[in-house]
């Protein structure tokens, strides 16, 4: 009887303890496995806004221009009075360009590109029984170079200077007139022989750039450009220097 009681006490104490210990060990393993899975699960991170410093951007731009010229007699050849050309008026015209902008410093941007620059002038006369109009357009392929100072982040303001080497691509002069019989006639000249093959211009600009997202921006940039060398060759009666005020606007993509 004594042995039976001892055996019963042993089973009553030892077996539940062992069973409880197994449950605790099982729970610990389950917790560790859950923590291990949680550690290996990739966490979603918010995309960081791309830093501008040291970055490069590409852009496409259009420019609406109010174009005119400085026209003076060529004292080095055979100077001639301006005549009716003194009454020429500005011409509204469009230009286009693509390029890149590199942030060489937090506040300094270098810009280079390729542009189709156009300038010109117009003339209009209206008499009692006749009219005459003309329009001259000079088209240049240019590699504009700009250096700008920039401030701001989401909205940036910038200002700087520019230099334009320009190669003549096309010249077009369109003249149209009517006579007393109300007949209309016109003539188009594309002769470039009287023009220098290359000219140089300088400019000043200022503008604003606004970010649309992580990579895209838009910009607006007024610019004044003046031609440093004459459009005409040395054997011309006049010296011709373009004077252009333009408003450039376009899209920028940050690489």
Protein language model regions, located:
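Predominantly the C-terminal beta-signal and adjacent terminal strand-loop region
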Residues: 192-195, 199-255
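Transmembrane beta-barrel architecture of outer-membrane proteins
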Residues: 91-95, 138-143, 156, 199-203, ...
